[in-house]
């Protein structure tokens, strides 16, 4: 029987020729399986084969990884090993798949960062008319916060997609799904002032332009958001998506229904929207602790 490393090389060739995977995915498989093979060789010697590996050895490998990388990366490496063994099972090269006995490590729940209301309000005021592109930048910030758009949705807007009189936006979301989202009065005013300053435009013209008069791109929007955020607070990094998180969190804290927020954000699944409930529950507990008389820490007895 072939040593493990030779079996991995054969599997990689299969992925490249039969599965037509991208170079990036192939490199990830190769890197993860070579790391696994190095651990097996250190434990069992260079002549060890895939059949020699049992679930106990695999558990030790994952335990070692647990001290070095995140659970999401552990899960990816385990998935690569599972695929490798499934391939060997189909070929009859092994009698079992030890990776099937190992549960995928649960990913850490990372709560989305958001600005508080005072920070969001201050951010909207940072661009000024005196600055180059100040009106444009304010319109961009107000639109992101007012409607919770993805940055790709914002950069894809044309003038015909906005209804300033009705306070509405037509957005093309993921998977080519169109949705209508409200546009707050501050955003309406900011967009109107921006369009007036540039002399309007045709219906099909991009809503937001760069310095050359072309459609603004996502990288430029990210730079705009980051630059203005640093005027109000010393955050390490804030992205346009932070304003999307901020929109959703403030909507929920204001009493909006989770289903309505799902529709506004263009989420296909409610489970994607539910992450914002964790943020708001933290806020509710903070309010409860401060406001409810029985929630306060009792004074120590003399």
Swiss-Prot record:
PROSITE patterns: CB, TYR_RECOMBINASE. Residues 2-89 form the Core-binding (CB) domain. The keyword Hydrolase does not apply. It is found in: Cytoplasm. Signal peptide: none annotated. InterPro entries: CB, DNA_brk_join_enz, Integrase-like_cat_sf, Integrase_catalytic, Integrase_recombinase_N, Integrase_SAM-like_N, Recomb_XerC, Tyrosine_recombinase_XerC/XerD. SUPFAM superfamilies: DNA breaking-rejoining enzymes, lambda integrase-like, N-terminal domain. The active site is at residues 150, 174, 241, 244, 267, 276. Keywords: Cell cycle, Cell division, Chromosome partition, Cytoplasm, DNA integration, DNA recombination, DNA-binding. GO terms for cellular component: cytoplasm. GO terms for biological process: cell division; chromosome segregation; DNA transposition. The keyword Transit peptide does not apply. Pfam families: Phage_int_SAM_1, Phage_integrase. CDD domains: INT_XerDC_C. Site-specific tyrosine recombinase, which acts by catalyzing the cutting and rejoining of the recombining DNA molecules. The XerC-XerD complex is essential to convert dimers of the bacterial chromosome into monomers to permit their segregation at cell division. It also contributes to the segregational stability of plasmids. Forms a cyclic heterotetrameric complex composed of two molecules of XerC and two molecules of XerD. This is Tyrosine recombinase XerC. It comes from Pelobacter propionicus (strain DSM 2379 / NBRC 103807 / OttBd1).
């Amino acid at each position: 029987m072939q040593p493990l490393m030779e079996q991995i090389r054969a599997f990689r060739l299969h992925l490249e020729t039969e599965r037509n995977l991208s170079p990036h995915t192939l490199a990830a498989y190769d890197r993860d399986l070579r790391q696994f093979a190095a651990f097996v060789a250190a434990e069992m010697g260079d002549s060890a084969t895939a059949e020699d590996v049992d679930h106990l050895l695999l558990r030790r490998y994952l335990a070692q990884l647990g001290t070095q990388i995140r659970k999401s990366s552990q899960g990816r490496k385990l998935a690569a090993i599972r695929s490798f063994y499934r391939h060997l099972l189909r070929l009859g090269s092994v009698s079992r798949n030890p990776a099937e006995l190992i549960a995928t490590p649960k990913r850490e729940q990372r709560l989305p960062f958001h600005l508080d209301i005072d920070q969001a309000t201050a951010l909207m005021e940072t661009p000024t008319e005196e600055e180059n592109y100040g009106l444009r930048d304010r319109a961009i910030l107000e639109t992101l916060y007012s409607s919770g758009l993805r940055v790709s949705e914002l950069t894809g807007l044309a003038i015909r997609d906005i209804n300033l009189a009705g306070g509405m936006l037509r957005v093309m979301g993921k998977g080519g799904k169109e949705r209508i989202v409200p546009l707050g009065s501050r955003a309406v005013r900011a967009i109107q002032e921006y369009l007036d300053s540039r002399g309007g435009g045709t219906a099909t013209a991009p809503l937001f332009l760069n310095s050359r008069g072309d459609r603004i791109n996502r990288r430029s929007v990210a730079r705009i958001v980051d630059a203005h955020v640093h005027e109000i607070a010393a955050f390490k990094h804030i992205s346009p998506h932070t304003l999307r998180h901020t929109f959703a969190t403030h909507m929920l804290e204001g009493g909006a229904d989770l289903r309505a927020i799902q529709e506004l954000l263009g989420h296909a699944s409610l489970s994607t929207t539910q992450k914002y409930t964790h943020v708001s529950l933290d806020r509710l507990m903070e309010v409860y602790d401060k406001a409810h008389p029985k929630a306060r820490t009792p004074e120590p007895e003399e």
